[in-house]
Amino acid sequence: MIYGIGTDLVRTDRMEKSLASPAFLRRVFGEEERAFLLSLAPRKQPESAGANFAAKEAFLKACGTGIGGFALWEIQVLRKESGAPYYALTGQAADLLEENRLTAHLSLSHDGGLAQAFTVLERTGD
């Protein structure tokens, strides 16, 4: 059963400017996320960071909490070896999924200076 759906769109040029701020990186991205983003070629960082940021906002929308629901760094977006994105949650974000028996599904895309994320939260075990 679908618990929530969220989507978000980010202009990657805005993210390019934000990536220059270490405080922004720490406030928004978890440790593993930062390591992944900084391992990319500089020209790839804004689109991947934009997609990750959009994924965080899409997750919050799917939860129904809005931007203040959880610390953004609790909602990490990582990549499988295949390149497929997934959520790695900690803190209150992880608690919400566990307490409500939810699985998070995520799709990311970026092109033409835009990054988009789509999230579905599915209740399992019903």
Name each model-derived stretch.
Residues 1-126:
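Core catalytic alpha/beta fold that binds nucleotide/phospho-ligands
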